[in-house]
């Protein structure tokens, strides 16, 4: 999955075990992200993933909220926001803690729905990513429960003129504004 639409302010300095990253490139909403098309869906998934990584690298959930209006994923990442805001730690070791590899050229329509789609792929957590914790031992980001190499799907729905990442907990009357670690 490729995404290359970022706002850059100053020279990017990667995080280390001694200091957090500086001037992390901020994902910008692609012009076609809300189009009801395969290209629009791809742009949405790419932006969603870039925003997810941005929260992990900065604690700033503002870009994620543009891809997650109901704050489902932003809330699930709140521990990172609090960690950065409280100067308790940061992520280091990689610029992209989470990557996704889509394994088909197009998504599949979810059965029984005209607005939901699944795009199969693999989600991987970087083995190099670590979490620095002030006054404590650093931790690996990837754990035995991380979904590495596991076949997953980006499950999305088009509703109210935009794409939403689904969690898998929506049921048939989805609250179309959610996302999932099991879906993506």
What are these regions (language model features)?
Residues 88-109:
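A short, amphipathic edge element
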Residues 1-30, 174-184:
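N-terminal low-complexity, Pro/Thr-rich disordered segments
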Residues 1-2, 106-184:
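Exposed beta-sheet edge and beta->alpha loop/turn motif
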Residues 15-93:
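Core segments of small alpha/beta cavity-forming domains
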Residues 68-71, 79-81, 96, 104-106, ...:
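A mature extracytoplasmic/lumenal domain signature
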């Amino acid at each position: 999955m490729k995404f290359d639409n970022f706002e850059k302010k100053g020279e990017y300095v990667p995080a280390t075990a001694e200091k957090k990253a500086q001037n992390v490139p901020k994902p910008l909403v692609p012009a076609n992200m809300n189009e009801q098309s395969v290209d629009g869906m791809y742009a949405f998934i790419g932006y969603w993933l870039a925003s997810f990584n941005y929260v992990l690298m900065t604690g700033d959930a503002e870009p994620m909220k543009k891809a997650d209006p109901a704050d489902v994923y932003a809330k699930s990442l709140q521990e990172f926001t609090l960690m950065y805001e409280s100067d308790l730690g940061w992520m280091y070791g990689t610029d992209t803690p989470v990557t996704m590899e889509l394994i088909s050229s197009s998504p599949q329509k979810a059965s029984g729905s005209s607005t939901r789609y699944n795009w199969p792929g693999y989600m991987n957590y970087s083995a190099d990513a670590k979490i620095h914790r002030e006054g404590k031992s650093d931790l690996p980001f990837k754990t035995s429960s991380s979904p590495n190499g596991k076949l997953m799907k980006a499950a999305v729905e088009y509703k109210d003129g935009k794409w939403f990442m689904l969690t898998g907990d929506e049921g048939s009357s989805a609250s179309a504004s959610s996302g999932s670690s099991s879906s993506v």
